């Protein structure tokens, strides 16, 4: 196949052309064929150097043009419609990094392969509606926004995924990478993605960002001039004496990046973190790099949200050796939270009766089919007891952490 034969959306910044991403076709049904088509059209496979823990991230060589809006009112109308879709998405789709974690394990065991890293290199990360991480949620939102075409012609073609690296310490060094992404890609893990729209209101330029993966229920607007409708700081969540605030702004060091500032206040003590979102070019390897990276991350969660992004119910746990513990939470006259052990679920009924009642309540509030959450937890328990598999998976995670440690 000749380079460049996939058109401008698949042209690469900092690397040779490679085919569009076609992994895991069989997981799609007619009901989500549009989502598959979107992935096929906008995603590719990155090249994978020998002994590197991840494929290399890739971006389109062409920037997206700004979507032209006639007035502030025109923009406000668009933002309000997108926000409704974001809120509906949060309510209808759980955030789920557990399902694909289990699928990877079960497929590995069926394969008969003993070397996890070799299998990991050949594995096509599936994107399914039941197992959406930040990647699937951003793609699902993009897919839904084609419904706005009647009111906002061409809007779908102006949307794109953008890549994010979290908790950056060396901001000036990182923002300088935009001029040499071809070599810098070796040190990037790109663990998060958002949906982005560049726009102009008359001659005023701005960005619209949507982040359903971090439960952000609003449309975030970032104006070059920082004037209205720039969003600025907002409270993302406030619970149990913990207040989390977000701010998104063009980086003063390099406007090809947006700084994502997070300010967390616990009992009066404040912590700050900064992530960097590369917005100059569409991100083409969200599935092959970001979703793949997520598969071996050492923290998993399955969460339901309301339209405002508030967490309703769920489970979460650390992935580490000799760990038998998970946390479950649900609503019952306020939020209830407790720790349980995976091993408890294999005990006689009398021992685990209380745990089963709580799991049933949580199952309902996650909107899962009856008995599904218990099945999921039993499968995770089996995985966590497989010491050889767990050790190999955590070794890959550690290799990725070492690779990106200097960012």
Model-derived regions, located:
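Mixed-charge, low-complexity segments
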Residues: 4-76, 83-131, 135-139, 147-149, ...
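Short, solvent-exposed loop/turn segments that connect beta-strands within catalytic domains
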Residues: 152-154, 200-206
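Short acidic (Asp/Glu) patches
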Residues: 171-183, 188-192
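Short, surface-exposed beta-edge/turn micro-motifs
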Residues: 191-192, 205-207
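Short beta-strand scaffold segments in enzyme catalytic cores
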Residues: 193-197
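Active-site catalytic microenvironments in core metabolic enzymes, especially phosphate/sugar-handling
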Residues: 208-212
